[in-house]
């Protein structure tokens, strides 16, 4: 059986990147929560 994690930078950025987060209301909510928590990295 192959491993389930087959990394792709493009897919990663499109699904979890900063611009993907900013594109939706809930995505902006995630970023706000991560800022409030003091995360060093906000998005992938």
Curated annotation (Swiss-Prot):
Belongs to the bacterial ribosomal protein bL34 family. The keyword Ribosomal protein applies. NCBIfam families: rpmH_bact (TIGR01030). Keywords: Ribonucleoprotein, Ribosomal protein. The keyword Ribonucleoprotein applies. It comes from Alcanivorax borkumensis (strain ATCC 700651 / DSM 11573 / NCIMB 13689 / SK2). One of its GO terms (biological process) is translation. PANTHER family: LARGE RIBOSOMAL SUBUNIT PROTEIN BL34M, MITOCHONDRIAL RIBOSOMAL PROTEIN 34 FAMILY MEMBER. This is Large ribosomal subunit protein bL34.
């Amino acid at each position: 059986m192959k491993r389930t994690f087959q990394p792709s930078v493009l897919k990663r950025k499109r699904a979890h990147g900063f611009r993907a987060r900013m594109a939706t209301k809930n995505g902006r909510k995630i970023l706000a929560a991560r800022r409030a928590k003091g995360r060093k990295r906000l998005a992938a």
